[in-house]
Curated annotation (Swiss-Prot):
SUPFAM superfamilies: ATPase domain of HSP90 chaperone/DNA topoisomerase II/histidine kinase (SSF55874), Homodimeric domain of signal transducing histidine kinase (SSF47384), PYP-like sensor domain (PAS domain) (SSF55785). Residues 5-78 form the PAS domain. GO terms for molecular function: ATP binding; identical protein binding; phosphoprotein phosphatase activity; phosphorelay sensor kinase activity; phosphotransferase activity, carboxyl group as acceptor; protein histidine kinase activity; protein homodimerization activity. It comes from Escherichia coli (strain K12). Residues 136-349 form the Histidine kinase domain. This is Sensory histidine kinase/phosphatase NtrB.
Length: 349
């Protein structure tokens, strides 16, 4: 009776579509299957003996936590790890386990697109719920503010002692400040006037406005796609969105300065708010600042969340609201030395 030849472990690993690495406790690579070589853009010979972090611009894996789990005799899994190599970002699911010979087997699988889309939709729903809650509170605050201000005005007219007017003035000024904050929290409630024209007109207005604020050590670079089709949009609202993002980039660079790139591209076959579009406009704002702190990234679009001292945390929340009204989306990637916001606006189905 004929028996089939059993494949060895090397053949199995070489045939896997997931990236497999064998690393030691110093994270030096001892084996990389073909999928891992393709991911890391290096041959097996060049990878051998090289510590994994040296090959990457950024790797969000919590290596200390992984090593603690392995030392405790447990496996380790992180379902959303960002890996950046040669300027390309990959979202991976990473699993690690200790082998009998003491080596660490690291398996890296691309995050399933459907699962990633579901996570994005859930996160967006949570952000919308948070925004609606803040708006409800803002409405409740705004109503008594009007009464407070009106009462202070009447009181200022009735006070016999002019020296007391200073107190009513403070009340009125603070009521106005709170009302302005509430108006910003509420944001635009209705779609504005749409026109069909090149998005580059808005981009150029933003460049003109921001150029007046640029210090000498910051470069603003334009990288436009001249073939980008015209699209229907509210120029004032899109200008506000891009201004918020570009100014955030400028503030993130700080006194050290750096570079901001305003880029436009055509995106193809994109799903936005459950609708499939053959064409969409992509507007990127990229900077080489310190990056967004990891603890802020999941809640960055929530109202009142800011990584900047003195910031209100409203700019990105309002920006997402405006882009939602255009049936578009905003997403970002960030690691030390790189942050990129991408705005997608539909052109045609």
């Amino acid at each position: 009776m004929a028996t089939g030849t059993q494949p060895d472990a090397g053949q199995i690993l070489n045939s896997l579509i997931n990236s497999i690495l064998l690393i030691d406790d110093n994270l030096a690579i001892h084996y990389a299957n073909p999928a891992a070589q393709q991911l890391l853009a290096q041959s097996s010979r060049k990878l051998f003996g090289t510590p994994l972090p040296e090959l990457l611009s950024y790797f969000s894996l919590n290596i200390e936590l992984m090593q603690e789990s392995l030392e405790a005799g447990q496996g380790f899994t992180d379902n959303e790890v960002t890996l950046v190599i040669d300027g390309r970002s990959h979202i991976l699911s990473v699993t690690a386990q200790r082998m009998p010979d003491g080596m660490i087997l690291l398996e890296m699988a691309p995050m399933d697109n459907q699962r990633r889309l579901s996570q994005e939709q859930l996160q967006h729903a949570q952000q919308v719920a948070a925004r609606d809650l803040v708006r409800g509170l803002a409405h409740e605050i705004k109503n008594p503010l009007g009464g407070l201000r009106g009462a202070a005005q009447l009181l200022s007219k009735a006070l016999p002692d002019p020296s007391l007017l200073e107190y009513t003035k403070v009340i009125i000024e603070q009521a106005d400040r709170l009302r302005n904050l509430v108006d910003r929290l509420l944001g635009p409630q209705l779609p504005g006037t749409r026109v069909t024209e090149s998005i580059h007109k808005v981009a150029e207005r933003v460049v003109t406005l921001v150029s007046m604020e640029l210090p000498d050590n910051v470069r603003l670079i334009r990288d436009y796609d001249p073939s980008l089709p015209e699209l229907a949009h509210d120029p004032d609202q899109i200008e506000q969105v891009l201004l918020n993002i570009v100014r955030n980039a400028l503030q993130a660079l700080g006194p050290e300065g750096g570079e901001i790139i305003l880029r436009t591209r055509t995106a193809f076959q994109l799903t936005l708010h459950g609708e499939r579009y053959r064409l969409a406009a992509r507007i990127d704002v990229e900077d080489n600042g310190p990056g967004i702190p990891p603890h802020l990234q999941d809640t960055l679009f929530y109202p009142m969340v800011s990584g900047r001292e003195g910031g209100t945390g409203l700019g990105l929340s309002i920006a997402r609201n405006l882009i939602d009204q255009h049936s578009g989306k905003i997403e970002f990637t960030s690691w030390p030395g790189h942050t990129e916001f991408s705005v997608y606006l539909p052109i045609r189905k």
